[in-house]
């Protein structure tokens, strides 16, 4: 159990610490520069359109495909600086209570400053489900998607 915890958490943190400090802390400087750019330009990201099933009219059903498409105007950011995902959870009292699973959307196209993200996912849970779409800054150098502090639900 202790070895598993060490492998899953402490080992990865130790490796990351070494990487961040390497080459005169180059990785740390790159992350800081990227975060400053995100902080400056994140407000420029505008949702142009969202196409999703209307779960207020009919519940999501087991085995059905869930199709989603979101178009974003990226402003000064590159589309690869943005990630989109769908969060699925159990519905209780008209709202999402517990997150059951998330599915990453893919960037399908980018033209004239507008990125199109989409996905198709089979529903593999029975019961009343709800969903939310969230976008967040993406960078392979950061430790988690919440690290930037700019997660936005649309």
How does the language model describe each region?
Residues 108-120:
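Aromatic sugar-binding surface patches on proteins
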Residues 75, 120-128:
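Short, surface-exposed loop/turn segments at beta-strand-coil junctions that are enriched for proline
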Residues 1-81, 139:
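C-terminal amphipathic helix plus adjacent low-complexity
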Residues 125, 136-147:
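Short acidic/polar inter-strand loop motif in beta-rich domains
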Residues 67, 128-132:
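Short, conserved beta-strand segments of beta-strand-rich sandwich/propeller modules, principally
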Residues 95-110:
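Solvent-exposed serine/threonine-rich low-complexity stretches and specific carbohydrate-binding patches
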Residues 69-73, 85-87, 120, 134-136:
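Residue-level recognition of well-ordered beta-strand positions that form the cores
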């Amino acid at each position: 159990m202790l070895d598993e915890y060490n492998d899953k958490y402490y080992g990865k943190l130790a490796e990351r610490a070494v990487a961040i400090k390497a080459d005169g802390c180059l990785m740390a400087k790159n992350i800081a520069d990227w975060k400053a750019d995100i902080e400056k330009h994140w407000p420029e990201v505008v949702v142009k359109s969202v196409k999703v099933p209307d779960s207020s009219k009919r519940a999501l059903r087991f085995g059905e495909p869930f199709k989603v498409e979101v178009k974003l105007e990226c402003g000064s950011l590159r589309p690869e600086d943005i990630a989109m995902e769908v969060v699925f959870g159990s519905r209780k009292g008209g709202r999402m209570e517990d997150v059951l699973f998330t599915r990453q959307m893919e960037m399908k196209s980018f033209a004239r400053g507008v990125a199109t993200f989409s996905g198709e996912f089979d529903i593999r849970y029975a019961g009343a489900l709800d969903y939310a779409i969230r976008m967040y800054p993406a960078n392979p150098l950061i430790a988690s998607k919440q690290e930037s502090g700019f997660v936005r639900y649309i």
